[in-house]
């Protein structure tokens, strides 16, 4: 009973003031073992929560990008306050099966948790290394030497939860154990999962995604952690949905309005085509022709069109009926198909032909009309179960960001939002000026987007420097390395210039000397280490050519 009371008191804290749970504290305690454990990731989760709430209060945002490896994590730590671990990057560069591919979430489900552990171990190591180095300094030296917070909270990609409830629970357990301060889970089908900027995305019902979020929260509660939970929706651009079981989804499902197709489903037509030996382009042409005839509309669109066609009433009566219908069918009301038909009948729309089963795909999916409004409905539904809401978008659009923010925060005013500053967008084709691009992050931060991230920023930056350096190195040899890398590391204060020290040779020398009474003839950083060259002082003046133009290196000191 004492443990149940302890959990209840924890839930009553400010941290969970806005969180809704459909289970009890007793349920949580019953799922715990007798051996209580603590997790380092919980300290990072608390740190992340404080950080995001501070950004929310100030109208600012944590900006970050997907990190590939410890090199990127240590350099990011000097300038950014969170770290992102991208499923896309893991899928393309570092799966546990070592089989690369696109972001279809078909890699082993421990792939992203393992990458989190890789980076979290690196964070802790460089934190220890820095502490050892600073303890060797005098008070004055410490005051002059900038301190780097290497322990930046990691937010990781949980994709769709990787299956049913038990799969989601086990995935979340892995993330906590491996060091994630936060994770995000999206509302796509786990069977057909796609990158948020690919076509063919299939949503699950709102209720199914809520179950995923509840499963995640339950696992965090069982482990006694405050891991930040981000709910992502792909409803802005999705065109399919797995099920029509949730009435909140009904207003966005498309149906056939052409009565000539009554009894002629698309799935049956495609099956007949395959049986007749058609394939590829022929089947696509068959589907395209059927869809062009179907006149797909939402139920609301079909009812509006039917009212406008009523010729036996005056224009004033027609406007009255349209206004009444729009009142009943406003998106906040989440009108069900059955309720909509009843209201339409009362407005004189009888025998309306609208069929959402006829256009279902061969896999059985319903047609869905994606939009910001659909995302708002889902964002509002997910808000009681998540800490941050993220709408995936097709382009960087401040108007859409505003619409989503206002829609969600009209119902949940204290909800924090996230935004993907995706490299899948062609930012130069967005219509924004350079100044507008510069102001994009702070502008939407004021709308509540407290966490903003370039999902695969690490991959693109890595590819760019490798490609440009490799090309130059092939042509100019070591001069290319010295100009492009070594001098730039020195000029910008990048600590990998002395890579032995960066990797921790001094740190492990301390171990050797401590074990051997303060002296070790085999110390890695002893006399003869080539890194001593970087302590020599010299001056070099002159012009250095780098591709286009040149820079002047004056008094470049080692």
From Swiss-Prot:
Cofactor(s), names only, from the UniProt record: Mg(2+)
Reaction(s) the record says it catalyses: D-threo-isocitrate = glyoxylate + succinate
Gene Ontology CC annotation, any one: glyoxysome
Gene Ontology terms: biological process: glyoxylate cycle; tricarboxylic acid cycle
InterPro entries: ICL/PEPM (IPR039556), Isocitrate_lyase (IPR006254), Isocitrate_lyase_ph_CS (IPR018523), Pyrv/PenolPyrv_kinase-like_dom (IPR015813), Pyrv_kinase-like_dom_sf (IPR040442)
Catalytic residues as annotated in Swiss-Prot or TrEMBL: 195 (proton acceptor)
Enzyme's top EC category: lyase
UniProt-listed Enzyme Commission number(s): 4.1.3.1
Residue interval(s) of motif Microbody targeting signal: 556-558
GO MF, one example: isocitrate lyase activity
Its job: Involved in storage lipid mobilization during the growth of higher plant seedling.
Recorded family membership: Belongs to the isocitrate lyase/PEP mutase superfamily. Isocitrate lyase family.
Protein known as: Isocitrate lyase 1
The organism of origin for this protein: Glycine max (Soybean)
Lineage: Eukaryota, Viridiplantae, Streptophyta, Embryophyta, Tracheophyta
């Amino acid at each position: 009973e004492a443990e149940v009371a302890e959990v209840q008191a924890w839930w009553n804290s400010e941290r969970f003031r806005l969180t809704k749970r459909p289970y009890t504290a007793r349920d949580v305690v019953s799922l715990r073992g007798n051996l209580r454990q603590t997790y380092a990731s919980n300290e990072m989760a608390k740190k992340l929560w404080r950080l995001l709430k501070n950004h929310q209060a100030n109208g600012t945002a944590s900006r970050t990008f997907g990190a590939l490896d410890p090199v990127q994590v240590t350099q990011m730590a000097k300038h950014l306050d969170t770290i992102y671990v991208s499923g896309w990057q893991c899928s393309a560069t570092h799966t546990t099966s070592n089989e690369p591919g696109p972001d279809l979430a078909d890699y082993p489900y421990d792939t992203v948790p393992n990458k989190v552990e890789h980076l979290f171990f690196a964070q802790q190591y460089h934190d220890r290394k820095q502490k050892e180095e600073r303890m060797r300094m005098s008070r004055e030296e410490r005051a002059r030497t900038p301190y780097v917070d290497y322990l930046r909270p990691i937010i990781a990609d949980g994709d769709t939860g990787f299956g049913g409830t038990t799969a989601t629970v086990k995935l979340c357990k892995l993330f906590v154990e491996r060091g994630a301060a936060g994770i995000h889970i999206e509302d796509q089908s786990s069977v057909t999962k796609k990158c948020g900027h690919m076509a063919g995305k299939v949503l699950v019902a709102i209720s199914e995604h809520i179950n995923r979020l509840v499963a995640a929260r339950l696992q965090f509660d069982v482990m006694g952690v405050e891991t930040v939970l981000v709910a992502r929706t792909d409803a802005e651009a999705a065109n399919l949905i797995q099920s029509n079981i949730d009435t909140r989804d009904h207003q966005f499902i498309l149906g056939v309005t052409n009565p000539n197709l009554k009894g002629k489903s698309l799935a049956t037509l495609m099956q007949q085509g395959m049986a007749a030996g058609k394939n590829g382009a022929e089947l696509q042409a068959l589907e395209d022709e059927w869809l062009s005839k179907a006149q797909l509309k939402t139920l609301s669109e079909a009812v509006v069109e039917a009212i406008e066609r009523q010729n036996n009433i005056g224009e004033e009566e027609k406007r009255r009926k349209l206004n009444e219908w729009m009142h009943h069918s406003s998106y906040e009301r989440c009108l069900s198909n059955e309720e909509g038909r009843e209201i339409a009948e009362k407005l004189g729309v009888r025998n309306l032909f609208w069929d959402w089963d006829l256009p279902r795909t061969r896999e059985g999916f319903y047609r869905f009309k994606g939009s910001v409004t659909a995302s708002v409905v889902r964002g509002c539904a997910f808000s009681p179960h998540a800490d941050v809401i993220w709408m995936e978008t097709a382009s960087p659009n401040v108007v859409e960001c505003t619409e989503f923010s206002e829609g969600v925060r009209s119902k949940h005013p204290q909800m924090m939002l996230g935004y993907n500053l995706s490299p899948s967008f062609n930012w130069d084709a967005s219509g924004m000026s350079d100044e507008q691009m510069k102001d994009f992050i702070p502008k939407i931060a004021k709308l509540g987007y407290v966490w903003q991230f370039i999902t695969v920023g690490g991959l693109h930056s890595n590819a760019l420097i490798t490609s440009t350096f490799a090309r130059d190195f092939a042509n100019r040899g070591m001069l290319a390395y010295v100009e492009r890398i070594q001098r730039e590391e020195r000029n910008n204060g990048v600590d990998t210039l002395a890579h032995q020290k960066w990797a921790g040779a001094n740190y492990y020398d301390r171990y050797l000397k401590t074990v051997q009474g303060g002296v070790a003839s085999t110390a890695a950083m002893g006399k003869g280490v080539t890194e001593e060259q970087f302590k020599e002082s010299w001056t070099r003046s002159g012009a250095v050519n780098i591709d286009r133009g040149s820079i002047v290196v004056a008094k470049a000191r080692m």
